[in-house]
């Protein structure tokens, strides 16, 4: 079973449409009313149905009740702030930690200028951008896992 159907260029009907400027030159069907009126609402309602169904079948459990007289040993931020928290926790100088965090967006802004000679849109044909992306993803995952561990095991992830 094929996901994409390749056009049969030997078909006389398709060749007649292509000669008139119709057909696959314009990527098939128009967005109005086909996509905007029929397909998008079905996708939106399907997404809402999945979210409601999953929340009914498996509701999220609430944590323990808050106790103002018993503070935890280590207070952790929300999960999406773990890598940033780990940088601030490990770097000895807090000003250096903040400077490291400002270097990330600056480095991301430099990528288009570094790789301006490459005109390809395919990420596999853009080695610098792909290497920076993979390195950043691996570093973020490493820092996120390390932030969830105690400080003495956070750099080695408890492996050594």
From Swiss-Prot:
NCBIfam families linked to this entry: cytb6_f_IV (TIGR01156)
Function of the protein: Component of the cytochrome b6-f complex, which mediates electron transfer between photosystem II (PSII) and photosystem I (PSI), cyclic electron flow around PSI, and state transitions.
Gene Ontology biological process terms from the UniProt entry: photosynthetic electron transport chain
Pfam families, alphabetized: Cytochrom_B_C
Entry keyword set: Electron transport, Membrane, Photosynthesis, Thylakoid, Transmembrane, Transmembrane helix, Transport
Gene Ontology annotations for the cellular component aspect, listed alphabetically: plasma membrane-derived thylakoid membrane
Entry superkingdom: Bacteria
Matches recorded under Gene3D superfamilies: plastocyanin oxidoreductase, Single helix bin
Membrane topology: Multi-pass membrane protein
Record's keyword annotation contains Hydrolase: no
GO molecular function, one term: electron transporter, transferring electrons within cytochrome b6/f complex of photosystem II activity
Organism in which the protein naturally occurs: Synechococcus sp. (strain CC9311)
Family designation: Belongs to the cytochrome b family. PetD subfamily.
Localization per record: Cellular thylakoid membrane
Presence of the UniProt keyword Ubl conjugation in the record: no
Quaternary structure annotation from Swiss-Prot or TrEMBL: The 4 large subunits of the cytochrome b6-f complex are cytochrome b6, subunit IV (17 kDa polypeptide, PetD), cytochrome f and the Rieske protein, while the 4 small subunits are PetG, PetL, PetM and PetN. The complex functions as a dimer.
Name of the molecule in the record: Cytochrome b6-f complex subunit 4
Alphabetized InterPro entries for the sequence: Cyt_b/b6_C, Cyt_b/b6_C_sf, Cyt_b6/f_cplx_suIV, Cytochrome_b_C_euk/bac
CDD domains xref list: cytochrome_b_C (cd00290)
Transmembrane domains' residue ranges: 36-56, 95-115, 128-148
PROSITE patterns: CYTB_CTER
